Amino acid sequence: MEEQQNINQEPEVKQVKKKSLGMEIWEWTYSILLAVVIALLIKNFLFSTTIVKGESMLPTLQPNNMLVIDRLSQIRGIMPERGDVITVEAPEATSDEGIAQYSEVNGLFNKLIHSFTKVLYVKRVIGLPGDEIEIEGNELRINGELMKEDYINEPMRYNPYLIDKIKVPEGHVFVMGDNRNNSKDSRYFGVVPFEKIEGEAIFRFWPFNKFGGI
């Protein structure tokens, strides 16, 4: 009889405690903040993406090409090699010594905003620390040697550049666009400090018919 009573007993129903509105808001806020932190870590220490603006890198890169930028080398302090395509923060001016100038950004919040809003240029590394760069007419010489570049499609026309002769100081690079006649680069704003290099452009993922390495 006792066994029959046990069989007929209904299982105990556990009540699930309903989350409060405050708890739900906190969980959503936490998830969003975590996603932002992860995105920032990836962008600043691993990889980022950029969209090519303008025609300064023709014919290598076209306007609206989308690129993957490798941040690891810059984070580890490895200087890029001559010929690398890199992204650099757009300078605001140049000094009398031919060094690109930038405004100082102070405060954690301001630096965070700046990391998302700063303008980037896509350029090719031409000169490394210690190199003597000389531009005369349509000729580019590095350490006295005439450079032959198969990635440009027309000769450089002479313009009265602000900087046509310079020895690249330590910790800096001299950059130029492949479209030499339509590029704002180190000929105008000077050599770029290493810390203003965003990273190396290693991959093009748009458009799909140009999908692949650079």
Predicted regions, residues:
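Hydrophobic membrane-insertion alpha-helices, especially the h-region
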Residues: 29-45
